[in-house]
Design a protein with these regions (language model features):
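NAD(P)-dependent Rossmann-like dehydrogenase/reductase catalytic/cofactor-binding core
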Residues: 2, 6, 10, 20-21, ...
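Short, contiguous, pocket-lining structural segments
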Residues: 14-18
Length: 122
């Protein structure tokens, strides 16, 4: 999911800022779910985020979202045969996240979930 957020940055400085903010939200979520904070620094944390952000389908979708397309329009026009894993995850976790977690603590996640669920521009 956060790779889409990072991909929406229209230049490297914006993407870098979004990467840092994404990591902060991930740290909050790990703490919220009582996970191991060291996870964030490993392959399952920033390692996976980096790989996804620089070359994955989620990042590519984020690029289209950052250019002003809705999720549905971008999927149909640019990625009709691609699986965007972040969409599937977003639809699975959104009911819980939107209902239970303080939206001010994870604004990037909340905005992206609403972008996907309600087909809004980012």
């Amino acid at each position: 999911i956060y790779a889409m957020v990072i991909g929406s940055g229209q230049n490297l400085n914006a993407a870098s800022d979004l990467f840092q903010k994404s990591v902060n939200e991930m740290k909050f979520l790990i703490k919220y779910f009582k996970g191991d904070q060291s996870t964030i620094l490993g392959l399952a944390g920033i390692g996976d985020l980096y790989v996804s952000a620089v070359g994955g389908r989620n990042s590519k979708m984020g690029e289209y979202l950052g250019k002003g397309f809705t999720f549905t329009a971008a999927k149909k026009k640019f990625m009709p045969k691609d699986t965007v894993e972040g969409e599937q995850l977003a639809r699975e976790i959104a009911p819980y996240i939107l209902r239970k977690i303080n939206k001010k603590k994870i604004p990037l996640m909340i905005n992206l979930l609403k972008t996907i669920l309600y087909n809004k521009k980012i």
